[in-house]
Swiss-Prot record:
This is DNA repair protein RecO. InterPro entries: ARFGAP/RecO, DNA_rep/recomb_RecO_N, NA-bd_OB-fold, RecO, RecO_C. The keyword Chaperone does not apply. It comes from Trichodesmium erythraeum (strain IMS101). Involved in DNA repair and RecF pathway recombination. One of its GO terms (biological process) is double-strand break repair. GO terms for cellular component: bacterial nucleoid. Keywords: DNA damage, DNA recombination, DNA repair.
Length: 288
């Protein structure tokens, strides 16, 4: 008799398997990332029905198998159906789901990661369906917020408050329109521009690997202030007043940082790019 176990899980990925089955990648708080078969879920009258769709949270009864475990029963707790009703929301949700699949552990409890992902998916889902500048700014801001928190839980979030070279705290200077600070992906965060010589000295003391350390981009005061919001549990209401382009730059910076430190190219990020291009005429003609 097959051994049974219970788990709560959110569907992150689904692949067709055989004639009517589906192979699901699921994040559970109890067992981390698991891959299980949802038998017959692609049949029109399947007893599992929509429980095998993406971003559905189920209470599961699973039977152990030789190679793959199988879902015996599934009861839906909640689902983020609103994500599929808007291309931007769907792209953002898939982006976070793909990132989670790279950082989640298998056969280990992932309670904090499970709740964190659900929290950010819910925020994105609850955004009102619009295509104006304000809505798009909030979408990218919420996505960047989720990315940062996932990196933080993995212990690899970029340093956004202290200079990576000196450890000194950096504050954006809004009174100087030319004020900038550097961001180094391999050094791990922000660097005061006039501290580049310190960076080189700092790197030589560590290893030859760090000799290639460089400032990848310069960011202005507003962009730094946005980065410095990301560690907070909630974004400030300033998100309604900030530049759409600044949030796009923050997301792209986090994307490059994430891909570098995980050694993985985030495929779902292309969906975000496609979406932003599709609405760019509306964004360019809109005002907040």
């Amino acid at each position: 008799m097959a051994k049974l176990y219970k788990a709560t899980g959110i569907n992150l990925k689904a692949m067709a398997l055989g004639e009517s089955d589906r192979l699901l990648t699921i994040l559970t708080p109890e067992y981390g990332l698991i891959r299980v078969v949802a038998p017959g879920v692609r049949k029109q009258k399947s007893k599992l029905g929509g429980r095998g769709e993406l971003f559905v949270v189920n209470q599961l009864l699973i039977s152990k198998g030789r190679s793959l475990d199988r879902i015996n029963q599934a009861e839906t707790i909640t689902s983020y159906t609103g994500l599929s009703q808007n291309l931007g929301k769907l792209a953002a949700g898939q982006y976070l789901a793909e990132l989670v699949q790279q950082i989640a552990l298998k056969e280990n409890p992932q309670t904090e990661l499970f709740h964190l992902l659900n929290e950010h998916l819910e925020r994105i889902e609850q955004l009102q369906h619009k295509t104006d500048r304000l809505w798009s700014t909030q979408l990218i801001a919420f996505l960047a917020h989720g990315i940062y928190h996932l990196l933080a839980i993995e212990g690899i979030a970029p340093q956004v408050h202290q200079c990576c070279a000196t450890g000194n705290e950096l504050q954006p200077d809004f009174n100087n329109s030319k004020w900038q600070v550097g961001f180094s992906i391999d050094a791990g965060g922000i660097i005061k521009v006039d501290e580049t010589s310190v960076v080189q000295s700092f790197c030589k003391d560590l290893s030859d690997y760090y000799l290639s350390t460089k400032i990848n981009t310069l960011i202005n005061a507003n962009q730094l202030s946005l980065l410095q919001q990301l560690p907070q549990p909630q974004l400030q209401t300033i998100v309604k007043l900030t530049s759409y382009q600044d949030w796009v730059k923050v997301e792209q910076l986090l994307r490059k940082y994430t891909q570098y430190h995980l050694g993985y190219s985030i495929r779902s990020a292309e969906l975000i790019d496609t979406y932003l291009k599709s609405i760019s005429p509306l964004i360019n003609n809109a005002t907040i």
